[in-house]
Amino acid sequence: MENQINIAGAGPAGLTAAIVLAKHGYKPTVYEMSPDVGHRMNGDFQGLENWSADKDIVALLRELGIDINFLCIPYYEGDIYAPKMAPLKIKSERPVFYLVKRGGADDSFDAGLKKQAVSLGVEIVFSRRIESFEEKTIIAEGPKRADFIAAGITFDTETKDCAVVIFNDEIAPKGYVYLLINKGFGTMASVIYKDFKNTKKYFKNLLNFFQNEKYIDIRNEKRFGGFGNFFIRNTNAFDKKIYIGESAGFQDYLWGFGLRYAVLSGYLAAMSIIRDLDYDFLWKKEIKPMLETSLVNRYLIEKFGDFGYRYLAKKFAEGDPCNFLNRNYKPSFLKSLILPIAKSRNKIYGNV
């Protein structure tokens, strides 16, 4: 059938593609090898970042055809820690990020997208992979290898709502720690880019840090882990296969925020089918510049170490962190000069 499209993977990217296709008269079938959506997630909080583009992420979701039928809380402020300096307060005029829940809970991002897809007549086949690729297929199966990993806990708490970020290589080498609390539930995690074999040590250091620096009431803790994959290749359209989300390497290499790229790439893949457009042209225009800028940002933050962490913390605190980040996520002449060096240090081009 001409209007029959198969989608491999029921994550945010795959479900977004399914929703957009269904709204335009197509009949997408989503195949998910897990028994339900969000199975790889753990009920943890994540952030829909709101700084890498001018358009507010919630406005973008609505523009793409996604309803906000899930927990989505704007956070405008928080605390930031960096080595050898006192913690600083940051505050923004626009939301720095929107807190969302991942996993299968009724108010999760994943479950919300599932409800929207099903309401439009999308068929989701769980616990099954696609067996044939004779029809046009969108591949949204998530990351394949770990370029960074996350180790953390979810927990119940009486601590008031907050957002905390820590830059410290003793806790999260070349990465960061985040603490998010909303209405009695919290997520605390260390995102690590180096020395994966010592993850347990860094997680222990994380718990010790919060015991010493910022008391957090933690009850009913549940541990979780995850990983992210980043690469940039020349094409993400192979014969009848279109790759989106982390299957295409679409991930912010600086800090691992991939949800914006997931939904945007799902939308672009759907529109390439609906309007018979070149998918590679679309993602290279809308996504690739941000990917390359994030690669340069990753190179710079690793190069400058503790000095870089303190510089970022001070910049976030002395002005509007969203505006500062937005400027630094945009391509520039200087970053175009640094890009070849960043490429040579990170062998992430051309991976399949």
Which residue stretches match the model-derived regions?
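Predominantly flavin-linked oxidoreductase catalytic cores and closely associated redox partners
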Residues: A10, S34, G104-K222, G228-T235, ...
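C-terminal auxiliary extensions adjacent to catalytic cores
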Residues: F304-V352
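N-terminal FAD cofactor-binding segment of flavoenzymes
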Residues: V37-A82, A151-I153
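A conserved FAD-binding loop/helix module that cradles the flavin
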Residues: Q251-I273
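Short FAD-binding loop at a beta-strand-to-alpha-helix junction that anchors the flavin cofactor
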Residues: A237-L254
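Glycine-rich FAD pyrophosphate-binding loop
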Residues: A8-A10, A22-D44
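Active-site-proximal substrate-binding core of FAD-dependent oxidoreductases
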Residues: I232-R233, W255, M271-Y311
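Beta1/beta-strand and adjacent pyrophosphate-binding region of the FAD-binding site
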Residues: M1-A13
